[in-house]
Amino acid sequence: MVNTSFETLALDMQIEILARLPLKYLMRCMCVSKKWASLIRGEDFRSAYLLRSMARPRLLFVASRSRKFTRETCFHSVYQEPPLLLSGKRQMLTDNHIAPVFTVSNPILGLLCHQGYNNEIVICNPGLKKFRNLPQIQVPEGASVRSFFGYDKVDKVFKVLCVCVPQTQFGAGWTSKEPKKYQVYTVRSDHEKPSFWRPIICNDDHSVVTDEGLFNGGFLYYGARSSCNKPMVMRFNVSSEAFAVIKLPEEVDIDYHWRLVNYKGKVALVNTFDSKFKFNGVFEIWVRNEVDRKWDKDIIKIPQWTESVDNYNVYFKGTTGTKELVFAPPNWFGEPLFVLYYDKATTNLRRFDIEGMDDQHYSFHTFLDHVDSTWLM
């Protein structure tokens, strides 16, 4: 191939130019030559592309629905910072690419982890419309699985943690002396050799009680119960693959109603079953103080709450880079889809309707800080 003016540029200049392109154009560039494909798949370019994408994070909506013969999942995203929700709209609709969605992880560096009701686990890059099915995890008969997704900053790989528990242990108050199984899968780049499920040891046997976990600062967090039914939060170091127990205040009797969220960069707990929040706009949030190793309770009262939510059920999803609190519904039944942004400093509550999705019944997940990345290219 004859050298073009682009190929005569310095490598860092080539990366700078390509990093400005949307993902769909990068896919086309990879077809130009093996050299371009190698450059775009490289670690230097991946880091440069992520850095630019993080400057404009996105709100990501993941919705699933059943039709007569198919199961569909819709990925819909918009920019989450000003001009808020009015630009950058992008949508992808899958048809049987992934199993019926049971849980969806928070996005990490552009990737999500889906777990189906049949325990099928799929890694997805919605920006690239790329999927990778992980090997079927082997579980004991009658057992169920909870999966959590994290990133190892040391080795620069993603990892999926799976906790296999006996069926009778699900839900708060259910305990058993039967041993659980803990396994990890390392998600590597396409050009690297495939991985496999590896058993790991946890010295603090526990059952998972929250449907979703939280990845924050190199650690995975999720709600759990000990073998003696004591509520706690488990912390998993994604790099060292070591578990640790975080004690909870006596007021927090954690079960599947609780959610772990990112609150201004800190790990926090909220109870989605709090009736005061649903009807009065008053909710309690427990924020983890790692310096003092304790949980601090914060009570937040939001003005004009009932006028803004119209009696819909909404969950607290976390905070944006501008420290605004974000709320969104857990389900969508064809009514206007919306999100709420609340600024504690100014007490300003804003509602934004989300357009571009049809009026079908969806189970619904809303995520903050989604970015474009070249993982799975």
UniProtKB/Swiss-Prot annotation:
Transmembrane segments: none annotated. Gene3D superfamilies: 1.20.1280.50. Residues 3-48 form the F-box domain. It holds the Pfam family FBA_3. InterPro entries: F-box-assoc_dom_typ3 (IPR013187), F-box-assoc_interact_dom (IPR017451), F-box-like_dom_sf (IPR036047), F-box_dom (IPR001810). NCBIfam families: F_box_assoc_1 (TIGR01640). This is Putative F-box protein At1g70380. It comes from Arabidopsis thaliana (Mouse-ear cress).
